[in-house]
Amino acid sequence: MQTIDFEKFSQYSKPGPRYTSYPTAVEFKENFNEESLKTAFFNHDHLKNPMPLSLYTHLPFCRSACYFCACSVIYTSLEEKKVRYISYLKKELALLKNAMDTNREVVQFHYGGGTPTFFSPIQLDEITQSIQEVFPNFSQDIEMSCEIDPRHFTKEHMQTLFDRGFNRLSFGVQDFDFEVQKAIHRIQPFEMVQESVKLARDYGIKSINFDLIYGLPNQTKEGFLKTLEWVLKLDPDRLAVFNYAHVPWVKKTMRKIDETLLPSPRDKLEILEALISFLEKAHYQMIGMDHFAKSDNELYLALQKAELRRNFQGYTTKKFTQTIGIGVTSIGEGSDYYTQNYKDLHHYEKALDLGHLPVERGVALSQEDVLRKEVIMHMMSNLKLDYSKIEEKFSVDFKAHFKKELEKLKPYEEAGLLVFNPKGFEMTKTGGMLVRNMAMEFDAYLRGGEKHFSKTL
């Protein structure tokens, strides 16, 4: 990786989407409603070759707030809230069964949160069984994954997940430095994570991911490299290393972070450069903009073939799936739509009580949206683009259709961050750190100066 000129590189730090979707969630509107979703379900069920399903279930509860967290969570210690939520998940599942063909093949299954393991093992088993009864056609090689908070993870949880077929776990680690953990209100010693990982390995979990975050309060380059040394002792298969997005105008809990303790933009860049170098020496390869995987991992192998895809659950080797969002605030995705359930629990429950799918908003994609989505997702996943793949799928002349966008990429080429070739273009290793910036050049919705997004660096 080329040495970063921090003064020049800082010019690229500006608000921008992470592109877990295109159009981004900012463009979701309330005129996409229950009827819109039912129509989308019907259309997808009746495709010549219906795509497989990915099921995402949101389990929103946490016992206490982690100040850095941007997820949609509900803080509680009340058992009755969890029991009530399970009853409403069952109501939603019953409505989904009537609204779509739930016998289609399921290739991905994911629990996100919140803290999924804040639910008891018996409750998790009940939820999983309820979903499997409605969506019974699980693929033989299904990816079943769950987010794990090591502070709420027992042998009984692991046994339940194992019995239900889970084969991938993602542990929220963030940082092992105690001063950082204290500043973000999440204390979990190395030994706690070590014990959780050992438990997962003992049960034969084949894929273990760690979520790490750089840019947190009290973090330094030296301190984060020490965290990475501890990480290597636990030998995860994959790492997601996220850039902390400090958006206190969006997430109120972030207001509890002392902003004077946050690393400067230059410090964050130094941490990023150091962590990429450290992980590559440890034989973890960079995947997309924020993931790393071992050289023999399926993610890296798919990257070599430019076959990676990106969705709300991260990077995947699966071909395009229709994602069904279950639970409060969950997001669903099809080939030409996105939908999101109510973010407010009261409104979510009220819709279900009235017998309605709890759709709050969404967006139907135009053909131009679908085209640009394909371009952006290829860039975000593979850090390069082959024009012919887009031209064959959409019957367009790429250079003519995206003449203005390609012109906007020229400065990246001049800065040594992007290389054009006869087939398309490819980002350099350093340029890959700016994939969000380059993808933004193809975003037809950006208006400039918006505060909806975190900074790209």
Annotate each language-model stretch with its function.
Residues 57-73:
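Local cysteine-cluster metal-coordination motifs and their immediate loop/turn environment
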Residues 52, 76-99, 106-396, 456:
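C-terminal scaffold of the Radical SAM
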Residues 413-423:
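A short, conserved structural fragment
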Residues 432-457:
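Short, amphipathic alpha-helical interaction segments positioned at domain boundaries
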Residues 1-53, 102:
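Flexible, acidic/Gly-rich N-terminal and inter-domain linker regions that tether
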Residues 397-411:
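Short amphipathic alpha-helical interaction segments
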Residues 69, 374-376, 438:
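Short alpha-helical scaffolding segments that buttress acidic/His motifs in well-ordered protein cores
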Residues 424-428:
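Minor-groove-contacting beta-hairpin "wing" of winged helix-turn-helix DNA-binding domains
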